[in-house]
Amino acid sequence: MADIIKLHDLRPAAGSNKPKTRVGRGEASKGKTAGRGTKGTGARKQVPAAFEGGQMPIHMRLPKLKGFKNPNHVEYQVVNVADLAEAFANGGDVTVADIVAAGLVRKNQPVKVLGNGEINVKLNVTADKFSKSAVEKIEAAGGTATATK
């Protein structure tokens, strides 16, 4: 029976770990210019990582950003009342899960119902948020609009 391989017995393949070349340590191996060539900026000193050869750098070409990013901003997925009327033509109760199942929005994200279009079906809609016009149109059609947030 073969011996079990143990972690402390593992060794890298021969030649896979080459020693680092120390440059500039005598004429025998990469001495004198140390792989930098003879003259020029690269031979004399390092240039900054963002240096673009005299061209106007990207951080100066782009405009400064104004304002700030609100950490409490919530991005809602929107669905219009016309889409709800088309997807749920039989009426009844409609939840966010039903809207996701109908393919109108993606799952695991808050949903806002907007009032674009017409609705003539009685729907009891439960969603995260509603616009005023959406609530008016849903209630005018005989349904209810319940916001969960």
UniProtKB/Swiss-Prot annotation:
Keywords: Ribonucleoprotein, Ribosomal protein, RNA-binding, rRNA-binding
SUPFAM superfamilies linked: Ribosomal proteins L15p and L18e
One Gene Ontology cellular component: cytosolic large ribosomal subunit
Domain of life: Bacteria
Region spans: Disordered: 8-49
GO biological process, one term: translation
Bias type Low complexity, positions: 31-45
MF-aspect GO terms: rRNA binding; structural constituent of ribosome
UniProt key word Ribonucleoprotein: yes
Annotated InterPro entries: Ribosomal_uL15, Ribosomal_uL15/eL18, Ribosomal_uL15/eL18_sf, Ribosomal_uL15_bac-type, Ribosomal_uL15_CS
Residue intervals passing through the bilayer: none
Job of this protein: Binds to the 23S rRNA.
Family per similarity comment: Belongs to the universal ribosomal protein uL15 family.
Complex and partners: Part of the 50S ribosomal subunit.
NCBIfam families given in the database record: rplO_bact
Xref: HAMAP family: Ribosomal_uL15
Name of the protein in its database record: Large ribosomal subunit protein uL15
Source species: Corynebacterium aurimucosum (strain ATCC 700975 / DSM 44827 / CIP 107346 / CN-1) (Corynebacterium nigricans)
